[in-house]
């Protein structure tokens, strides 16, 4: 949208910039950037726990110069169905903002006698499970559980209904207690989270959101902290951003300088083959 700086940024930059610059020869990059459009670069910073993401992408003087994308009925990041990269990234940040070392990652299954009739029935069963947990917690003087649940559902002609829940929940409950309160199946697994310092919860998020054979949907408790998102036109100027896109050492140097107290992890650079603009995505973690 156009704000007080009169830049147009109301477009899907993740969809508009998809060609990996690392896969291109220098001559191809120069050809694509010859007629480059865009008068500034906007930086979107997302802080989630000790993780930080920076999206750096072109802003335009008018709508006509911005790349066209298929807007249609785009799914929102907070959707129940995990059907696109945006939803998975949102979920990863939500996990990073709320969970860490000592919290619990669990998988709960159903035996044949307790299979839900539908995904909605599975949601109801899991909601009842959380109510049982929270009753125990209130008696112990604890707050309600913080959790994220991803439900995987399939209904195959040969195998029939298959359903299970991947859950990340705060570590206030004992693992045995959590398993005992689940009454729909016995093939369950719980473990304490011990995240990698660089990727934090990304490994868990990637696993529980991997492309399923059936459907995946997710829900979260209402007491979670939201990732902190800010936007700026002044963090990286146009010339700086364009040099960062083609000089990996300079990219790491400028990103590290822009976010003191954070360690650079990795970055990827993409280019739009119509307007020659760059999109930089960088990840960092707090030292």
Give short role names for the model-derived ranges.
Residues 164:
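Conserved, short, structured surface segments that act as functional micro-motifs
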Residues 1-161, 171-287:
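Right-hand nucleic-acid polymerase module
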């Amino acid at each position: 949208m156009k704000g007080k700086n009169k830049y147009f940024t109301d477009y899907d930059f993740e969809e508009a910039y998809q060609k990996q610059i690392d896969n291109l020869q220098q001559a191809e990059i120069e050809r694509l950037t010859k007629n480059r459009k865009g008068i500034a670069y906007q930086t979107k910073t997302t802080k989630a726990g000790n993780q930080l993401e920076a999206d750096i992408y072109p802003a335009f003087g008018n709508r006509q110069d911005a790349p066209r994308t298929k807007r249609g009925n785009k799914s929102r990041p907070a959707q129940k169905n995990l059907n696109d990269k945006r939803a998975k990234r949102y979920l990863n940040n939500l996990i990073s903002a709320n969970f860490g070392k000592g919290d619990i990652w669990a998988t709960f299954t159903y035996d044949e006698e307790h299979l839900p009739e539908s995904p909605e029935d599975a949601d109801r069963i899991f909601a009842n499970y959380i109510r049982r947990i929270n009753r125990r917690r209130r008696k112990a003087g604890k707050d309600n559980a913080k959790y994220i649940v991803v439900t995987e559902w399939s209904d195959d002609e040969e195998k029939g209904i298959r359903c299970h829940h991947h859950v990340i929940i705060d570590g206030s409950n004992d693992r045995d207690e959590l398993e005992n309160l689940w009454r729909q199946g016995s093939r369950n697994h719980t473990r304490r989270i011990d995240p990698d310092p660089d990727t934090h919860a990304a490994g868990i998020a990637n696993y529980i959101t991997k492309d399923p054979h059936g459907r995946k949907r997710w829900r979260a408790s209402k007491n979670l902290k939201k990732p902190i998102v800010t936007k700026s036109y002044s963090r990286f100027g146009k010339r700086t951003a364009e040099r960062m896109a083609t000089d990996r050492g300079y990219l790491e140097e400028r990103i590290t300088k822009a976010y003191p107290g954070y360690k650079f992890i990795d970055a990827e650079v993409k280019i739009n083959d119509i307007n020659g603009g760059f999109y930089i995505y960088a990840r960092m973690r707090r030292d």
